[in-house]
């Protein structure tokens, strides 16, 4: 069986084992694979979801075959990103079988290790396959990696096999990745200095439960996929789908060695005590690391790399070109195209990949993912820069820093360490600007101009830079929010107060010229002088000592200088007493230097304000850029950068970003969300709910950063209008679920539970009627399925994070979800696991409360709904009487199985979803729930 047939079978929704990739690559089958992929990819979003599951599975399967490849591709495509994490041991031109079919079953912790009969252990994927094409033969041994007391992998050493064809001691298995052309630089894998840097795998154990170890599942794969995602995202945001397919195989956490190979081993060590991923210096070792190549043959990986490169070059055309070389790339490109057509469903997936990486960074579930995520974010930023050219590189810059911060990577780059971000300063080097041999990581978005992820890899975990916080407020002289400035404006110096008071005693209605003169002499603004006189007149009036004779018995307009001559000012002291201006001229000469200095300071403040305005236009301060739904949010959504690019193009939400301070999350959803500003609809209670859920949104943005599903969660964040925690169920489904909690009992909300996360953003429709609101919850598990594998635990994290925001139980749920995701992932060896994980993630959204909550709509609600209230509306709409919050909570606390089943509504299909068949998602799409709510039962969940 060749890879083409594997892809074909996987597109049919079959579970196929991830490491069939050792099969030989036959170029004649590429067309068939591309057709299958194209057909599947050209299906509906749900099909795309299923295909994404397949593509994601294919991407995942191919990623299983190509997860490493995607990562490798990212490494290769990123012009050999400094981190070539997943490098296949096979080249496309060679029919070399991968020496390792999969990681050892010891990836999972002892408490969760699969049984001998489980797919993870019994699958031939995990059986070592000798490499038949290397000149030196040897027995390959899979040695279980030691684990710490938490069940997490300790430092791992990986002995890398070196291809006899490699040069400069680089384990590049083929200098030419393209089967068709040996001279095509697009398909050429550089085996020189770009391959020098190593990604030092690591993950933070501080945030993980003893039983949870997302990294042990697909540490390398996730990283690689993230790298691919970065490349693809940077290129098309479509290729991200291809790249995004999470690696379905567990990371090679065990010591893999070849006996009698005579080849020096390449050691990959990851300290477990640090939270931010770090890159080894480019000079540290010239051997490229590709742990996933043991898992997945290098053919697909190289293909994905080509795709990434091609995608980076032509985005889509290159993908087609890559199709000749890459089954997965072609399909993925098609998927990406479909995704772009579908409001970038795949892009959302891509965003999920990036987001997953970002989320992983935040979740520290996959430090490698963190690295990849940073790469993705940076690449996305670069990608945004290329596409948007809206100073996105500046935004990206801030975003990268911001994402790193969000991702717990503390990648804060000081402006002194960052290059000039103007396009003219971008180095034409395909890898990154500056000296490639410099151990100091460089800002990578600058190289994104060439669609390079290397800088991202280099930037991933460099916490040594000086901390730069773009969120720092800029002092503005006219800003009422600045306390110091406010005090300075309102508290006058004694000399100023004396002069103004003396003038006021003579004339309480100075002319415009008088006020201008006072302002200039006192170093005050004209407005400040006018306000002072106005306040003084009001104070005088309150004291009752107003002299009506001076005003002719009528109230004089406060600041109407034009009517000065029309006032009865004949008795004005300034006029009758020779003018008050002389008072200033005759004032103490000692005041002049002080007043002049104040005046100079005033002018400096004005100039400073003007300059800062220009700087702020160039600098995208994330927390100030929410109003810019497309560009700034994308920048803010560095995690969403890929999605943001697509979403930014698609952003139709007027106010969502503003409503949800979820910069990243809102961007994805906002871009696709067509719903009007929720603050415009509903009662003041709904506004208060919005305020409450802005926190959720903020959490969502965190969730977004936390996991791939966060892109979905981003949608969820947008849709996490669901003021009721139970809506948060599904985290993903919540994406579309926007629930307004109005105090009107007649308000009805319809949830079209279409688990198309991608489609959700695209399909989110909200009626303007105050009575009924329809929510199309199109959270296709594409993103989730797409996230299957790498993204799965990310999704779990997202769901968990999401649930964490909503539920107090989130900690337990979070651990359960992550734990389950990892387990499901491990159980299914990746492909099925990805889907299952996605489903599990979507349903692990269980978070036990969230999914259950959501499932409350799906199942628990059904149980709780009186039969007299049931009716039909387009599909199965279920009317739900107001339930006590406690009852709803109980429903939410419903079984996770119910969540899975309820959420999919086609419970069985959910397993299929795990198989990569997004039937459940489709079913979910068909499921619509009508729910009546009141402030007492739903809205008031404090």
Swiss-Prot record:
Keywords assigned: Coiled coil, Developmental protein, DNA-binding, Homeobox, Nucleus, Transcription, Transcription regulation
How does a null allele present?
Answer: No visible phenotype. Hbx2 and warA double mutants form fruiting bodies with an enlarged basal disk and lower portion of the stalk and the anterior of slugs is not as cylindrical as that of wild-type slugs.
Indicate the segments annotated as coiled coil, or none if absent: 835-865
**Residue ranges, annotated region (Disordered):** 32-149, 161-494, 537-580, 609-942
Residues making up the signal peptide according to the UniProt record: none
Task: Cite the GO molecular-function annotations of the record.
Answer: DNA-binding transcription factor activity, RNA polymerase II-specific; RNA polymerase II cis-regulatory region sequence-specific DNA binding
Q: What is this protein called?
A: Homeobox protein 2
What is the name of the gene encoding this protein?
hbx2
